[in-house]
């Protein structure tokens, strides 16, 4: 009888994120969508095609009413920053967005605290841009001819 051949397990060295030289910044794009119901923080590569991290305020708190709160946005932003550092992203461009269209053009309550938490986490911030969709000629707003009566 011959000895049974056993394969030794190969150890693969896996690195996350791009290969960069020392002292070079690796940029990602942080899309912050802050409505009055929730805050989405979505990190992509520079082209915007590949999602790296996506965390919402609703993933951080239990109560539905707290999804859009500044506290939930801050927790989400801290998680995003930690994950970005693991992936090797050291600098970010921020694209801030409100609901827009024929709805409100002002960002929700979580926008400012999310941005502040990203800045305090040690990420370098390149550009901050408002990408709220502003209609040039829109569909009719809801509320009827005489508007919303309080």
From Swiss-Prot:
It is found in: Cytoplasm. GO terms for biological process: translation. The keyword Oxidoreductase does not apply. InterPro entries: Ribosomal_uS11, Ribosomal_uS11_CS, Ribosomal_uS11_sf. This is Small ribosomal subunit protein uS11x. Keywords: Cytoplasm, Ribonucleoprotein, Ribosomal protein. One of its GO terms (molecular function) is structural constituent of ribosome. Belongs to the universal ribosomal protein uS11 family. GO terms for cellular component: cytosol; ribonucleoprotein complex; ribosome. It comes from Arabidopsis thaliana.
